[in-house]
A protein has these predicted regions:
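Acidic (Asp/Glu) carboxylate-rich active-site/surface patches
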Residues: 1-186
Length: 186
């Protein structure tokens, strides 16, 4: 299973441009089982406003994606996740999300979960998942650009700040939370 992923160029998605990601993802989504969870900017902002930080939100998205996968496919294999924080912090994120019944039940019964630092560079399955996730983000942003007739940039830099001002003038501040993550300091 793994060799063909190398042949089509699967590697750490941070090393690939968006065109390459979309090309590779179009092959992956036809050949491997996957599930995604898309958190809109509005949903992200609501979670921030409720006091969750970016890492807790990342934990939420990972868990929701795994639950979506579990609903679509039967599996009893180990789950390997790119370790994006310390294990103590991840356990804390889990406690913060334990009010969500599906999450709480999932973590009680799932002992086959491992966090691997720089997992995207070491495990092809993680690299594949990251490429598919980025592909879905690319498509989401393309649809958002088309909907608003506005080319949104990703990131938090001076160009994005100028773009926020331009968007606000054109569409009003009330629409800002629908299209950007409002907690970034630029």
């Amino acid at each position: 299973m793994i060799n063909w992923t190398y042949e089509i160029g699967v590697r750490d998605s941070k090393l690939l441009n968006d065109d390459k990601i979309d090309k590779i993802a179009s092959i992956l989504i036809k050949k491997i089982p996957f599930a995604v969870y898309v958190l809109t900017q509005s949903g992200y902002n609501k979670m921030i406003n409720k006091g969750f930080n970016a890492n807790v939100i990342k934990f939420f998205i990972h868990t929701q994606s795994i639950l979506n996968f579990q609903k679509r496919y039967e599996f009893d294999k180990k789950i390997i996740i790119d370790k994006y924080s310390t294990l103590n912090a991840i356990n804390n994120y889990q406690r913060k999300m334990s009010f969500i019944k599906d999450f709480s039940e999932f973590y009680k019964k799932n002992e086959l979960m491992y966090f691997l630092e720089h997992g995207e560079q070491k495990i092809q399955a993680i690299a594949c998942a990251s490429i598919i996730a980025r592909h879905y983000l690319n498509n989401y942003m393309k649809n958002q650009n088309d909907k608003w007739g506005f080319n949104f940039l990703l990131g938090a830099n001076q160009k994005v700040k100028s773009q926020i001002n331009e968007f606000t003038k054109k569409f009003g501040k009330q629409n800002l939370e629908k299209v950007i993550k409002t907690n970034f300091k630029i």
